[in-house]
Design a protein with these regions (language model features):
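Surface-exposed amphipathic alpha-helical tracts and adjacent flexible/coil segments at the periphery
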Residues: 1-174
Length: 174
């Protein structure tokens, strides 16, 4: 896995563990000292998402796997509002960045993807217009350039509180 995945997953699980510990009334504690602070909001859907299932936790279920694809489709970003010769307008609230990777299921339920060459609001200009895309289809972002860029720099720090006491042991020696 790449560094973006590792940073995102580690931060997300660390926050979950902190929540569990905070609600445990002292029953659980961290094995390490200090506190980690993150410069981003962890979101597992942004770096890895194949959907999920409760498996057999609630009894047997028909949705135990994804029948359409074993690949990560990413985060839902909206539906296709219109398709023009060189651009696609998306209905939704997602912000797009140049270089984002988007995908969709075509009419044969096959996963297809394309790269956003340029984005202006909710209008995207693909590097190459995808075939098989039609109005009303759901779009998913499986590569989020803004999130990737955010995580390439310093994204976390760990601070440990200390108490120090300094004494002079000999004149001039501390």
């Amino acid at each position: 896995k790449d560094i973006t995945y590792v940073k995102n997953v580690t931060a997300a699980y660390s926050r979950k563990l902190n929540d569990i510990i905070a609600r445990s009334n002292g029953r659980y504690c961290r094995a390490s000292l200090g506190r980690s602070n993150y410069t981003f909001e962890p979101n597992l859907d942004k770096t890895f998402s194949r959907g999920f299932t409760h498996y057999f936790a609630d009894g047997r279920s028909a949705d135990m796997s994804s029948p359409l694809t074993p690949k990560a489709i990413g985060q839902y970003v909206g539906t296709v509002k219109s398709i023009n010769r060189n651009d696609i307008t998306v209905a939704g609230t997602a912000a797009f960045s140049n270089g984002d990777g988007l995908c969709f299921f075509n009419g044969n339920d096959e996963l297809q993807g394309f790269r956003v060459n340029r984005a202006q609001g909710n209008t995207i200009f693909p590097q190459r217009m995808p075939s098989g895309l039609s109005r009303g289809q759901a779009l998913y972002r499986n590569s989020d350039q803004a999130f990737e860029k955010l995580l390439t720099g310093k994204s976390a720090e760990r601070k440990i509180n200390i108490t120090m006491s300094l004494k002079e042991s000999a004149p001039g020696n501390i």
